[in-house]
């Protein structure tokens, strides 16, 4: 057959789908170029050339740069390589299809090779298979059903032959238990076999029991012959695609030899010779074994020898494909580990994850980062050295030809210059380091491409790893500067999570104008000031900027004209250089003119009269005293009116990240991202200038305690230690009152821990009282720039209790924490309380305990990083292809609907101004009132306000708003109108007349213009908050849930209010939820009671639910031996039963013993009186009666007499939030249904934290709600807030198939169809072999597949399909209807 070479066509083609399948031996031969027969690699002569028909034959491609391929004549870069093949002397099992081979053998008759299904069953399954669009999952499920049906039959429906069990036996061996049968044998083959041994059995009886163990060995040759005989109509029932491969293709009879380019020979410099690839060496071994078997067969060697060689050949073929086989016999085990095909594909460094899904890139740089507050927040300083290496291909045109010529003249060594020129219509590049640059510059033509250096103003991508969320890579504008580090504004540290202690960052230069535009608009720093997790600002002032702004805005900061002008002048840089700064009138005129720091700060928001910004904000600061608003004595109520700071000092809440009451956030939402970024850049220049001129430092003097503080500390310690001694004494004398659900020891620990934490808190308070307002650590803690009050008190007063796993330091050995203390000591010092401060220094024992707590923190962090990294990878893989469509639904790449509208309202979490809400109406209204005072307009009365708002909302512009949003606005306006009415009533103003005109202008007035502007603003903001079609909502959801995980802890926490009840929180809890674990570590059912204010009723219900064992309510359980009888006597403790409020008596105990698994009949249990139960065991042999009694005595205390067996305990929880005590039960354990059905429990208000349990009891919707609530509860406990829309999307994905699917390799396989996607996640080889077996077709539509194939994905920009505008034809004239009469036409009323 003549083979035509592949020719690259000019027609651009897109891969529409990939079909997986198996190659038949004939296809392998057609695809290959040579048959490989020689085991030698090189010829033995002096040339040392690769041998023809050897494994390194150059007709299979080339692995050397200077040698062309002998088949196609191309060089190493262009030749894709060509295959060879080896004919195996004996067939071998393919290790990848070994499970599939066993599966088929279990489904077919080993005599007639037909599938073991009756004609009706066959028809039924074939009808099902004919359904169009049968999914991969359905195929796998069907194969399982067919296999189960076939395995249940042991007689073939067609030939009547007996079929035993087929199973794997040892390494790549299959046996058929053909003769193992207990029934009367009907099969003549088996009968003949057994009869042939009759004579032998007569002579040797020992042979008989061994006959049943006789097995048929199914070697590859036998299996191949069986598979070849399978009828063509049965192949679809094996769930194989006949076009993609037949069952006989599962057995190797011919082996493909891969091209040389994927297994290159490396010439060794150290010793003469070459280093060969693992695959090459494995192939030579296979050829050698092939030759050995061939010789043995020709020479007629012993079968034993041929079988051994065959086994070894089979092993080598298996290792060639997968070198990590387990169970290899020692005598056959390879000497050194090699890499097979599977190893090349799988794992992080494999082809899928290492080279296809992600790869190293050109046009990138990496170096150390440094801060530079003089740069704008959207800029990055790039070293000249980097700028000379990174190039951008710019097309020469009329506008830039002179500039390009200048760059060409400069060449590669002078910046700005150019490195290469590519002339129009040629592929050749000319390097500018050599040659006549002047001549090249003159010869430049339009359309030529100059690869110029990176210059100021270029768009670059800046990234820091680990990239946990989308803000870890953003677009900046380059500024080429001297020195060797990347520099950027510190405001942008938070999204990158960068610090300057040696961190390195990556820089990428986009290579097309389209990429630059897309990067700036979508990834620009200004476009990403807020986090998509919950819409909070992430790029904001930090550390020194906060300290500077705080000190600048204190109420006692004043400047003369020169100083004020000097500080304000620091903002006149870059695009603000030419603005005319408006200096406000001085706040103090006499005795000297002085400007306040607040006035200077206001110039950041509105530097000149030309600036249109009118920002308005009213919010509480960190130190707000709680009353008086702007009259707060700490000056911590911030009021900004039309961009003027009226009151309050700046702190982290008003300038920093993580708060929506932030000045920059207000600017962003009301005036746009450019104004917010400009204000931030101005602050970043002004605050450090002021701080460096004022001076701000920290030294040992700042943390030196005074005498008064030391005295107060010792008094506190003395009182606290005394109280702890009293608790310990109470425990020793047995007077300590136990807390609910706790032992005496646990109660003591809880009390002492509480007492010691009070000591530290009080010492901290005393410390803060003594510190001066100018104390540097105190200033940093007050403004939130660094540290907290606890850090200050630890430095000055007292370090406090060291906690290990949430409790005091445990006893290490010999019942004490260290040998320096007495045994069983409970003293604070012995259990890790550090009374010293860092200033005074720690004693050796304190230091040791302190290091224990520190070590725990380090280990926790290290473990957590790995856990969350893997969790985030799983989340991203499962959610990545979810995308909001143009019909507002959220669908996967295959078109499955996950949500009918994103988050229930179609709004973008990044655009939320309130908590999970698109708008904060009160703030919007206050802003409108300040910006549009409308003093000449009359105010609206209550009724006018409501009626006017309703008439405005009936306009067409409001039709696009959802009803729920319009209802929210109406509700807010109604509240405002009620407030106006109350104010008017208070001052006696009626709607008609006025008492005093001036009063009307001051009170809560709203004019028609203000109302209209308010409603317009609400509508605009709502429309802007809509989620854009094409948004990768899945990826955002995965990052928003995965990224906070890194800030969580791994430990379990005490359940709120109950010291003894632990609950898993943090990373392990999130992991449990998204894995959809069936058995969680701390299942807790929260049960509301019918009477929630009665403690006795709560105890009664607790007794009904909690598992009570017979041993717990018995005074004793004894054996009684009488001359004629023996039994076990159980004496119940009636007092204990009464105190525990149990509904138990002797009769119920008798019933419980009978229904337990002790095999005791009702007649064997006798009740005597109220409290005595006798259990008489059944007689069997008298000798074992004693043992029967002993086992009964051991098992009886474990009999459950009341309660739910799955419940380990229930705790009464007292809720005092509403002012009066409310009781509910916290039940540890499962069986939600039984708890809900318990008398006294409100079933409709009972919930569990176990998703699986909820799904089993209440169904899939309840399970979905549980997932949402549990993730939110866990996040809130760690101080994280995630927009509910993200959590809803995750829970919808986990439950949309009708069962709860975990985000694991098993859940993912049930959610996704794509082979490439599953292969790029985990179990790479298994998925590929399965796909080949089923003949699977991958339509390449998801994100992973598109990245692997290098084609644009249908998400974001790729979702939109540009349609051709058809020529508009005139509509044909309307034809009159039969019997039509114009007189009867009814006009359409509009």
UniProtKB/Swiss-Prot annotation:
GO biological process: DNA-templated transcription
Compartments where found: Nucleus
SUPFAM superfamilies listed in its UniProt record: beta and beta-prime subunits of DNA dependent RNA-polymerase
Class in the EC hierarchy, top level: transferase
Gene3D superfamilies attached to this UniProt entry: 1.10.132.30, 1.10.150.390, 2.40.40.20, 6.10.250.2940, 6.20.50.80, RNA polymerase ii, RNA polymerase II, clamp domain, RNA polymerase Rpb1, domain 3
One family name in Pfam for this protein: RNA_pol_Rpb1_3
Cross-referenced InterPro entries: RNA_pol_asu, RNA_pol_N, RNA_pol_Rpb1_1, RNA_pol_Rpb1_3, RNA_pol_Rpb1_3_sf, RNA_pol_Rpb1_4, RNA_pol_Rpb1_5, RNA_pol_Rpb1_clamp_domain
EC number: 2.7.7.6
Gene Ontology cellular component terms for the protein in this record: mitochondrion; nuclear lumen; RNA polymerase III complex
Reactions mediated catalytically: RNA(n) + a ribonucleoside 5'-triphosphate = RNA(n+1) + diphosphate
Binding site for Zn(2+) 2: 109, 112, 156
Major location (coarse): nucleus
Residue ranges the record marks as coiled coil: none
Residues annotated for Mg(2+) binding in this entry: 499, 501, 503
Family, per entry: Belongs to the RNA polymerase beta' chain family.
Subunit structure: Component of the RNA polymerase III (Pol III) complex consisting of 17 subunits.
UniProt-recorded name of the protein: DNA-directed RNA polymerase III subunit RPC1
Organism, as annotated: Gallus gallus (Chicken)
């Amino acid at each position: 057959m003549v083979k035509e070479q592949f020719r690259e066509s000019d027609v651009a083609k897109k891969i529409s789908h990939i079909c997986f399948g198996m190659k038949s031996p004939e296809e392998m031969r057609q695809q290959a170029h040579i048959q490989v027969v020689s085991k030698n690699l090189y010829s033995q002569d002096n040339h040392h050339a690769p041998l023809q028909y050897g494994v390194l034959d150059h007709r299979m491609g080339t692995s050397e740069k200077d040698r062309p391929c002998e088949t196609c004549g191309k060089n190493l870069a262009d030749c894709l390589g060509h295959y060879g093949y080896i004919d195996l002397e004996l067939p071998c099992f393919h290790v990848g299809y070994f499970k599939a081979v066993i599966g088929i053998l279990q489904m077919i008759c080993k005599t007639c090779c037909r599938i073991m299904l009756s004609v009706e069953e066959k028809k039924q399954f074939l009808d099902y298979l004919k359904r169009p669009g049968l999914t991969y999952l359905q195929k796998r499920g069907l194969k399982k059903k067919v296999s189960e049906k076939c395995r249940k039959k042991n007689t073939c429906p067609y030939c009547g032959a007996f079929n035993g069990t087929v199973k794997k036996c040892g390494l790549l061996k299959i046996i058929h238990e053909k003769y193992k049968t207990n029934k009367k044998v009907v099969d003549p083959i088996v009968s003949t076999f057994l009869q042939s041994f009759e004579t032998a059995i007569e002579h040797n009886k020992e042979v008989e029991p061994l006959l049943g163990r006789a097995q048929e060995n199914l070697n590859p040759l036998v299996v191949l012959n069986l598979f070849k005989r399978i009828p063509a109509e049965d192949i679809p029932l094996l769930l194989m695609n006949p076009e993609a491969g037949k069952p006989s293709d599962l057995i190797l009879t011919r082996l493909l030899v891969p091209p040389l380019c994927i297994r290159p020979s490396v010439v060794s410099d150290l010793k003469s010779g070459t280093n060969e690839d693992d695959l090459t060496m494995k192939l030579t071994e296979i050829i050698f074994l092939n030759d050995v078997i061939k010789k043995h067969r020709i020479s007629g060697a012993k079968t034993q020898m041929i079988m051994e060689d065959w086994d070894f050949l089979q092993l080598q073929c298996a290792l060639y494909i997968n070198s990590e086989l387990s169970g290899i016999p020692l005598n056959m085990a390879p000497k050194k580990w090699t890499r097979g095909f599977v190893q090349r594909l799988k794992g992080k460094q494999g082809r899928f994850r290492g080279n296809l899904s992600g790869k190293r890139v050109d046009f990138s740089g990496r170096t150390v980062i440094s801060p530079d507050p003089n740069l704008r927040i959207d800029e990055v300083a790039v070293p000249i050295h980097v700028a000379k290496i990174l190039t951008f291909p710019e097309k020469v045109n009329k506008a830039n030809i002179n500039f390009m010529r200048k760059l060409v003249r400069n060449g590669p060594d002078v910046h700005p210059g150019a490195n290469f020129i590519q002339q129009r219509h040629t592929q050749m590049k000319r390097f500018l380091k050599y040659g006549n640059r002047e001549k090249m510059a003159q010869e430049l033509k339009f359309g030529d491409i100059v690869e110029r250096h990176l210059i100021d103003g270029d768009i670059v991508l800046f990234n820091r790893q680990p990239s946990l969320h989308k803000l870890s890579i953003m677009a900046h504008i380059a500024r080429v500067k001297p020195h060797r580090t990347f520099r950027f504004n510190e405001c942008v540290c938070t999204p990158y999570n960068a610090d300057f202690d040696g961190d390195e960052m990556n820089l990428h230069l986009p290579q097309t104008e389209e990429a630059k535009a897309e990067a700036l608009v979508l990834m620009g720093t200004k476009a990403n000031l807020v986090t998509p997790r919950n819409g909070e600002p992430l790029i904001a002032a930090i550390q020194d900027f906060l300290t500077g702004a705080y000190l600048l805005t204190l109420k006692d900061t004043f400047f003369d004209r020169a100083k004020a002008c000097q500080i304000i002048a620091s903002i006149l840089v870059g695009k603000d250089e030419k603005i005319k700064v408006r200096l406000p009138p001085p706040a103090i005129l006499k005795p000297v003119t002085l400007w306040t720091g607040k006035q200077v700060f206001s110039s950041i928001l509105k530097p000149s009269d030309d600036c249109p910004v009118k920002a308005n904000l009213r919010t509480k600061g960190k130190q707000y005293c709680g009353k008086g608003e702007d009259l707060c004595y700490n000056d911590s109520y911030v009021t900004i009116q039309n961009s003027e700071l009226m009151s309050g000092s700046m702190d982290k809440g008003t300038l920093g990240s993580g708060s929506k009451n932030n000045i920059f956030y207000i600017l962003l939402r009301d005036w746009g991202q450019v104004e917010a970024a400009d204000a931030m850049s101005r602050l970043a220049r002004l605050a450090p200038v002021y701080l460096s001129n004022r001076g701000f430092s920290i030294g040992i003097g700042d943390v030196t305690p005074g005498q008064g503080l030391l005295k107060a500390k010792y008094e506190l310690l003395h009182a606290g230690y005394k109280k702890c001694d009293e608790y310990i004494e109470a425990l020793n004398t047995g007077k300590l009152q136990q807390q609910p659900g706790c032992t005496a020891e646990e109660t003591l620990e809880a009390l002492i821990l509480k007492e010691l934490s009070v000591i530290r808190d009080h010492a901290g308070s005393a410390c803060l009282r003594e510190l001066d307002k100018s104390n540097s650590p105190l200033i940093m803690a007050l403004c939130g720039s660094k540290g907290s009050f606890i850090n200050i008190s630890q430095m000055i007063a007292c370090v406090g209790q060291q906690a290990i796993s949430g409790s005091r330091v445990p006893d290490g050995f010999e019942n004490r924490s260290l040998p320096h203390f007495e045994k069983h000591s409970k003293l604070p010092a012995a259990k890790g309380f550090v009374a010293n401060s860092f200033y005074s220094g720690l004693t050796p024992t304190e230091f040791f305990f302190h290091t224990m707590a520190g070590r725990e923190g380090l280990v926790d962090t290290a473990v957590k990083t790995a856990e969350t990294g893997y969790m985030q990878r799983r989340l991203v893989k499962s959610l990545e292809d979810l995308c909001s469509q143009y019909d507002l639904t959220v669908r996967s790449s295959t078109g499955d609907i996950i949500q009918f509208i994103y988050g229930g309202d179609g709004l973008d979490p990044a655009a939320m101004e309130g908590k999970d809400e698109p708008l904060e109406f009160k703030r919007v209204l206050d802003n409108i009132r300040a910006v549009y005072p409308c003093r000449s307009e009359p105010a609206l009365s209550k009724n006018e306000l409501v009626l006017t708002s309703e008439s405005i909302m009936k306009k067409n512009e409001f039709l696009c708003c959802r009803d729920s949003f319009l209802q929210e606005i109406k509700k807010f306006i109604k509240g405002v109108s009620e407030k106006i009415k109350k104010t008017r009533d208070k001052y006696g103003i009626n709607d008609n007349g006025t008492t005093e005109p001036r009063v009307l202008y001051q009170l809560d007035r709203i004019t028609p213009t203000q109302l209209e502007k308010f409603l317009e603003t609400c509508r605009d903001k709502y429309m802007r908050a809509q989620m854009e079609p094409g948004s990768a909502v899945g990826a955002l959801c995965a990052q928003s849930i995965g990224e906070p995980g890194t800030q969580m802890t791994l430990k379990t926490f005490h359940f709120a209010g109950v010291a003894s009840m632990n609950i898993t929180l943090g990373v392990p809890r999130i992991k449990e939820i998204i894995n959809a674990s069936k058995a969680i570590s701390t299942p807790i059912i929260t049960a509301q009671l019918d009477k929630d204010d009665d403690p006795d009723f709560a105890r009664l219900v607790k007794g009904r639910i909690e598992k009570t064992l017979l041993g717990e309510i018995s005074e004793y359980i004894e054996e009684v031996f009488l001359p004629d009888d023996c039994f076990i006597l159980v004496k119940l403790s009636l007092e204990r039963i009464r105190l525990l409020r149990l509904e138990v008596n002797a009769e119920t105990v008798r019933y419980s013993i009978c229904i337990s698994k002790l095999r005791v009949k009702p007649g064997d249990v006798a009740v005597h009186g109220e409290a005595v139960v006798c259990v008489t065991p059944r007689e069997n042999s008298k000798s074992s009666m004693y043992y029967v009694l002993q086992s009964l005595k051991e098992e009886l205390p474990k009999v459950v007499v009341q309660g739910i067996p799955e419940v380990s305990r229930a705790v009464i929880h007292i809720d005092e939030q509403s002012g009066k005590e409310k009781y509910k039960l916290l039940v540890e354990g499962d069986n939600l249904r039984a708890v809900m059905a318990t008398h006294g429990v409100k079933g409709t208000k009972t919930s569990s934290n176990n998703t699986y349990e909820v799904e089993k009891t209440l169904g899939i919707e309840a399970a979905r709600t549980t997932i949402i609530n549990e993730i939110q509860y866990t996040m809130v406990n760690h101080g994280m807030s995630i927009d509910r829309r993200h959590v809803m999307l995750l829970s919808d994905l986990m439950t949309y198939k009708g069962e709860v699917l975990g985000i694991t390799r098993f859940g993912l396989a049930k959610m996704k169809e794509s082979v490439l996607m599953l292969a790029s996640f985990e179990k790479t080889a298994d998925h590929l072999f399965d796909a080949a077996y089923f003949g699977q077709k991958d339509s390449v539509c998801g994100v992973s597949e598109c990245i692997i194939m290098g084609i644009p994905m249908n998400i974001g920009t790729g979702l939109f399909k540009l349609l051709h505008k058809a020529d508009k034809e005139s509509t044909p004239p309307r034809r009159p209807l039969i019997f039509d009469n114009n007189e009867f036409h009814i006009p359409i009323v509009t």
